[in-house]
Amino acid sequence: MRSEQPLYNKRLFSDIIDKSTHFKEGLGLDKQKYLLDEVKRIEDLKRYEYEAYNNGFRYIAGIDEAGRGPIAGPVMAAAVILSRDFFCPGINDSKKLTALKRSKLAAEIKKQAISWSVAAVFPSYLDKVNILNATREAMLLAVKNLSPRPEFLLIDAVQLPDIDIKQYPLIKGDSLSVSIAAASILAKVERDRVMEAFDSLYPGYGFSRHKGYATREHLQSLLRLGTCALHRVSFEPVKSMVLGARYGEQPALFE
């Protein structure tokens, strides 16, 4: 599957403008221009979706993950099926958005989506199967919870084994596909909420601030408190810290 040029659907392009509540009489010219530019940008982000539609697929799911890099917390994946006329101004790769913007967009994506699902794999299992396999399992769980069942998958970089649905892994897909961008936002927002909830269950680590990433604050709390059930013991420096504790050694986290 390859798409180099935007595959605009002119009828849908016009319908979005005509039907959108954003285009009400009296809207300022600057806002109108912004929204028109967003229509064009988002239609361009649908190029892979349109190619799949043109090949006879009706339900196309975008899939992405959040939380592969942290040393604590689950890896989470989201799967989203959007309609052909989906329009959500501001949608983009979640990494390019503020937390507040992501939260607002997530609510709108859930409102407009045909179906959406989020799944998680926690460290107790992640450490047994490795982060790549844990990511795949979270993605598979998210896909299986969609209804209707998707007929085609657009996935950010990862190939999913053991699933009888046609798929296309797209490098940097969260910047190239509107469906993957939507999934990236949902996965990130839901994971952040999970880590904020765990902050009260495991006080002192600062999970609500760093979300499990290896910040200096987090590493200092590890030295002070030791590990908790959320920490990934297969990830460094947690692995060395756990091994050091077993043999009476103190890891040098800041060398």
From Swiss-Prot:
UniProt-listed Enzyme Commission number(s): 3.1.26.4
Enzyme type, top EC level: hydrolase
Residues annotated as domain RNase H type-2: 58-247
Record SUPFAM superfamilies: Ribonuclease H-like
GO MF annotation terms: manganese ion binding; RNA binding; RNA-DNA hybrid ribonuclease activity
GO (cellular component) term, any one: cytoplasm
Any GO BP annotation: mismatch repair
Cellular localisation: Cytoplasm
Known cofactor(s): Mn(2+); Mg(2+)
Family as reported in the entry's similarity comment: Belongs to the RNase HII family.
The name this protein goes by in its record: Ribonuclease HII
Organism: Syntrophomonas wolfei subsp. wolfei (strain DSM 2245B / Goettingen)
